[in-house]
């Protein structure tokens, strides 16, 4: 065994240290100030405790400013939460407390569940523990000792967790002062390094191990950041997100609802269905003259899904069906016992349409589009309004082309996707290329060619946008059947949503034996490109509702104008105004109720109606209207003709405006 350890630093320099030197020793050898800031080390990219002995490899000193420190901060905060709870409520059992996206949680076994009122008290105790600046210290125990100690403490859940640790793994115990817990680590040097930028968010129930047959525990969710400003920003975004929650706005705007008899499927109300149809009509216009719109069956025999591979790869997410007679009479030889499946994807159906009739290379590319209703099983706990459903409509398209046409088709698709997002106000978009995973179909040569083409396309996307569109690579994140582009857009409060995809598929055409006749009269397998812009149209509508906080652009609002009268003397004029607005193509309702105008304005503002036209006796005499915009206290008076012309222009979809502008002579 060598007496020295060789370490390579980020600047490329190499230094030797005595065997047994710790990460802290290395940090101190660089500077006292760095050692003070250090919270951990990374050896060959793996984060470890500062107190761990170093080994040969590449080393980095991790400080609180390092993005990798955030997980440590949250992990350590979870431990402090557990200590605080056991100090305040002796006898409470701690179970598990992992770091999750945007924070952490800890599950506790306690006779009386926690309440939201307990959280500020626990936070106060946590700050006391952090102020003590107790060092984190690691020990390795035998399995027998760990079981004995935690059993003696009455920690039955910890004993179960210890028993579940594989025999070849050490039982690590982390101390912070006198409190200790089994944990894989790593941790920072002391509780004081956590800081005070943390908050306990909510209390919830959770079954032990996620199994409803097990005891119910109390879960406390929290979050933590390196800086208070980061926490404040996060809490601000959460507050904004709550105001914008599409489920809440959907009720207020009377758009849709869900109910127990149809978990994960949408009951669209009149206004919501208008919005859905507006999105469909917009997308249909964008595809006109470029794609053939088709429609494939929703229910297909299991054998087709076996051929496509979905039955083997995706079965747990599929709905299988039989005739009701077959279900109730399983032994009836006369009953049709075949198993069918509701389609989870549109692609196999589109391959069947492509295969119907011989195709020549001269006919390629063939572009098939469908607003296809698909069904995918999601666990009930994962369902979330329009964002996560079991039945949804995909704005799906599949392009069948030659390898030589692939780059041009990907660029054409990209231009369409970015144009659609811009029409809906999304200007910040990131495009990432996901490359080959370890498990995949198709030869390396085929992947090489596809990835080479798509890498060039990615460069072209960034160059053509003048750098406005950010791009990146996701190594190994491609599907097993081909590389793909993922489009992520940023909404009004900075949240990111992955929506569009462009995916090359080497698998499905081969499975179904799809081919075209090439210029040499040979059968050749086409390249298949899957394309979605909205992805799920229901989810995209949810994103739009939250992005605009319900204040939809006039061209996309399901109800554009409410004509509200101040007095019954203006009702006839109000009817005339509404009729003229409808004749001009606007979506209009009237409100002639015997209520004060401020009450009417308030009610329609809650419903997020973009324009309220107020008509009184004077307006009727002068044939004018008072226009009040959603979110504004100001009223603008104009003639009815002026108002109609202005609103009709504003209510014209952006793609229609562009088309009209292109037709105008120069």
Swiss-Prot record:
Subcellular localization(s) per the UniProt record: Cytoplasm
Function noted in UniProt: Catalyzes the attachment of threonine to tRNA(Thr) in a two-step reaction: L-threonine is first activated by ATP to form Thr-AMP and then transferred to the acceptor end of tRNA(Thr). Also edits incorrectly charged L-seryl-tRNA(Thr).
Residue ranges constituting the TGS domain according to the UniProt record: 1-64
GO molecular function, one term: metal ion binding
Cofactor binding mode and count: Binds 1 zinc ion per subunit.
SMART domains per the UniProt record, alphabetical: tRNA_SAD
Names of required cofactors: Zn(2+)
Protein's GO biological process: threonyl-tRNA aminoacylation
Residue ranges crossing the lipid bilayer per the database entry: none
The species this protein was found in: Allorhizobium ampelinum (strain ATCC BAA-846 / DSM 112012 / S4) (Agrobacterium vitis (strain S4))
Name by which UniProt lists this protein: Threonine--tRNA ligase
Keyword Transcription regulation: no
Positions bound to Zn(2+): 347, 398, 530
Keywords (A to Z) from UniProt: Aminoacyl-tRNA synthetase, ATP-binding, Cytoplasm, Ligase, Metal-binding, Nucleotide-binding, Protein biosynthesis, RNA-binding, tRNA-binding, Zinc
Pfam family, one: tRNA-synt_2b
Annotated stretches, region: Catalytic: 245-553
Assembly notes: Homodimer.
């Amino acid at each position: 065994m060598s007496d020295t350890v060789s370490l390579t630093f980020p600047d490329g320099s190499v230094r030797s240290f005595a065997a047994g030197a710790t990460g802290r020793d290395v940090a101190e050898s660089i500077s006292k100030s760095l050692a003070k800031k250090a919270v951990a080390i990374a050896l060959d990219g793996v984060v470890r405790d500062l107190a761990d002995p170093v080994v040969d490899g590449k080393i980095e000193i991790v400080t609180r400013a390092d993005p990798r420190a955030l997980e440590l901060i949250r992990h350590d905060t979870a431990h402090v939460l557990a200590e605080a709870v056991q100090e305040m409520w002796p006898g409470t059992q701690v179970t598990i407390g992992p770091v999750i996206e945007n924070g952490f949680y800890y599950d506790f076994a306690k006779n009386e569940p926690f309440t939201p009122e307990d959280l500020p008290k626990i936070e106060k105790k946590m700050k006391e523990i952090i102020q003590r600046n107790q060092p984190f210290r690691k020990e390795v125990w035998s399995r027998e000792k760990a079981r004995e100690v935690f059993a003696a403490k009455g920690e039955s859940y910890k004993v179960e967790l210890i028993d579940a640790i594989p025999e070849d793994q050490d039982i690590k115990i982390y101390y912070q002062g006198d409190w200790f817990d089994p944990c894989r680590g790593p941790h920072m040097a002391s509780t004081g390094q956590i800081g005070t930028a943390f908050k306990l968010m909510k209390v919830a129930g959770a079954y032990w191990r996620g199994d409803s047959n097990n005891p119910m525990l109390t879960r406390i969710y929290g979050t933590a950041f390196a800086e208070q400003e980061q926490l404040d920003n996060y809490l601000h975004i959460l507050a904004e997100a709550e105001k914008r929650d599409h489920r809440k706005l959907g009720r207020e705007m009377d758009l849709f609802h869900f109910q127990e008899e149809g978990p994960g499927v949408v009951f669209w109300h009149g206004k919501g269905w208008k919005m859905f149809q507006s999105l469909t009509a917009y997308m249909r216009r964008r595809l006109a003259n470029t794609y053939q719109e088709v429609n494939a069956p929703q229910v297909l025999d299991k054998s087709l899904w076996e051929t496509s591979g979905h039955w083997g790869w995706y079965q747990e997410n599929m709905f299988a069906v039989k005739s009701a007679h077959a279900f109730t009479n399983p032994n009836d030889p006369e009953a049709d016992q075949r198993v069918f499946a509701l389609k989870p994807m549109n692609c196999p159906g589109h391959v069947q349409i492509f295969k119907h009739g011989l195709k020549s290379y001269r006919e390629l590319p063939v572009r098939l589009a469908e607003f296809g209703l698909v069904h995918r099983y999601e666990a009930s706990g994962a369902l979330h309004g329009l964002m996560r459903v079991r039945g949804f409509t995909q704005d799906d398209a599949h392009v069948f082309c030659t390898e030589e046409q692939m780059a041009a088709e990907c660029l054409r698709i990209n231009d369409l996707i970015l144009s659609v997002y811009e029409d809906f106000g999304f200007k910040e978009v990131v495009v990432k290329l996901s490359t080959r995973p370890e498990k995949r179909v198709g030869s390396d040569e085929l992947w090489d060619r596809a990835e080479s083409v798509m890498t060039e396309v990615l460069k072209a996307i960034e160059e053509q946008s003048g750098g406005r569109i950010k791009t990146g690579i996701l190594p190994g994140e491609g599907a097993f059947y081909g590389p793909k582009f993922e489009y992520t857009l940023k909404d009004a409060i900075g949240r990111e949503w992955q929506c569009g995809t462009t995916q090359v598929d080497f698998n499905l055409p081969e499975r179904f034996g799809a081919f075209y006749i090439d210029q040499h009269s040979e059968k050749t397998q086409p390249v298949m490109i899957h394309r979605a812009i909205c992805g799920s149209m229901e989810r995209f509508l949810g994103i739009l509702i939250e992005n605009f906080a319900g204040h939809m652009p006039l061209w996309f609002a399901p109800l554009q104008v409410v004509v509200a009268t101040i007095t019954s003397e203006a009702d006839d004029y109000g009817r005339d105004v509404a009729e003229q607005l409808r004749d001009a193509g606007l979506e209009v309702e009237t409100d002639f109720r015997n209520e004060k105008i401020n009450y009417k304005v308030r009610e329609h503002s809650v419903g997020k109606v973009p324009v309220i036209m107020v008509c009184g006796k004077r307006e009727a005499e002068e044939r004018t209207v008072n226009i009040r915009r959603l979110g504004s206290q100001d009223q603008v008076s104009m003639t009815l003709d002026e108002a109609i012309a202005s609103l009709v222009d504003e209510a014209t979809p952006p793609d229609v405006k562009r088309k009209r502008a292109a037709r105008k002579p120069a």
